[in-house]
Amino acid sequence: VHLTGEEKAAVTALWGKVNVDEVGGETLGRLLVVYPWTQRFFDSFGDLSSPDAVMSNPKVKAHGKKVLNSFSEGLKNLDNLKGTFAKLSELHCDKLHVDPENFKLLGNVLVCVLAHHFGKEFTPQVQAAYQKVVAGVANALAHKYH
């Protein structure tokens, strides 16, 4: 991902304020509610029968935290996203058979959640930088599919 120094600084500064537990759970939960077909990958998570059930599900929250911790690793390695996500790409492609389009959806949901949490602080410039990052991460996660 090519980010200017200003964009990297904006992404890093905002990410330092992110509560990974809260934002991770909300991001994955929203993905599962807004795009319900993604629930098929989470059969073992128990009750996903309603938006409230999804958003309060402890397994959704725990996996959301895990997802955002991986995203944090990506932010530390923006110059090598494919390398950073190689094993996860392989897992999601070969074992889990996740449609790579879902990575783009998740990235866009993350941007929505960040905008919701940070309001005016999430300026159009910050959003533009994050859109580049989530697109780069989605591309890296889809790499094994190519």
UniProtKB/Swiss-Prot annotation:
Protein's name according to its UniProt entry: Hemoglobin subunit beta
Tissues in which the protein is found: Red blood cells.
Classification via PANTHER family: HEMOGLOBIN FAMILY MEMBER, HEMOGLOBIN SUBUNIT BETA
Modified residues (S-nitrosocysteine): C93
Entry-annotated residues carrying N-acetylvaline: V1
Keywords carried by this UniProt record: Acetylation, Heme, Iron, Metal-binding, Oxygen transport, Phosphoprotein, S-nitrosylation, Transport
MF term (GO), any: heme binding
SUPFAM superfamilies (UniProt xref): Globin-like
Positions carrying Phosphoserine: S44
Source organism: Mustela putorius furo
Modified positions (N6-acetyllysine) in chain numbering: K59, K82, K144
Modified residues (Phosphothreonine): T12
Quaternary data: Heterotetramer of two alpha chains and two beta chains.
One GO term of the biological process aspect: hydrogen peroxide catabolic process
Ranges of residues in domain Globin: 2-146
InterPro entries: Globin, Globin-like_sf, Globin/Proto, Hemoglobin_b, Hemoglobin_oxygen_transport
Name of the gene this protein is made from: HBB
